[in-house]
Amino acid sequence: GVVVGGGLLGLEAANALKSLGLQAHVVEFAPRLMPVQLDDQGGALLRQKIEDLGVQVHTEKATTAIVPGSDARLRMNFADDSHLETDLIVFSAGIRPQDTLARACGLEVGERGGIVVNNQCTTSDPNIHAIGECALWNNRIFGLVAPGYTMARTLSAALNKDTGAAFTGADMSTKLKLLGVDVGSIGDAHGQTPGARNIRFHDEQAGQDMHQTQHA
């Protein structure tokens, strides 16, 4: 089986296929696994760990077509003229905000989708609110459940006349849940915040790598 998407859910899905006795592959468009949470060094180490589990990893692969295969049910054609045949494809390639109703109602939506909300999770119509993965806050869509919970608490407080209620962001820490592979990511993993400094701790013998970003 092939999982399209090398993020958290994609890797967990690939591990599930492997545990069922299937030959598992991960196909990722980016040059590394978990591209949002990890840098190049962390991604390389994770790839090694994942392949040690028996899951084959294919990065920098853009799927151009899925057609009937010759040795398997399906054939995935990639932009680099390579291909991969499989009987099963699982897509775990990110989220897309469900904002069709909001568009139909004339609410403000983002250029790439998502219902625009303010710090009180209120849309462009003061009588309509949005939370979770459909909400676009500060030009950002959150693809994790934790921010949705935080938004829900904020909105509940605001509806109960708490004038101090405000959504100011959420805990974006993530942890990969695979047997024998421990990966955690918190904060600004890529050090893109102005004034950030990267500090790296690497234990080659133990196969452990940790990056810490500090801000001036």
Q: Each PLM stretch: what is its role?
A:
Residues 65-72:
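Feature captures the FAD/FMN-dependent oxidoreductase FAD-binding
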Residues 1-7:
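Beta1/beta-strand and adjacent pyrophosphate-binding region of the FAD-binding site
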Residues 134-216:
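Mid-to-C-terminal Rossmann-like scaffold of FAD/NAD(P)H-dependent oxidoreductases
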Residues 72-77, 82-157:
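FAD-site-proximal beta/loop scaffold in flavoenzymes
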Residues 8-65, 148, 167-182:
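Rossmann-like dinucleotide-binding cores of NAD(P)H-dependent redox enzymes
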Residues 8, 60-62, 112, 118, ...:
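Conserved beta-strand termini and adjacent loop/short-helix elements that scaffold enzyme active sites
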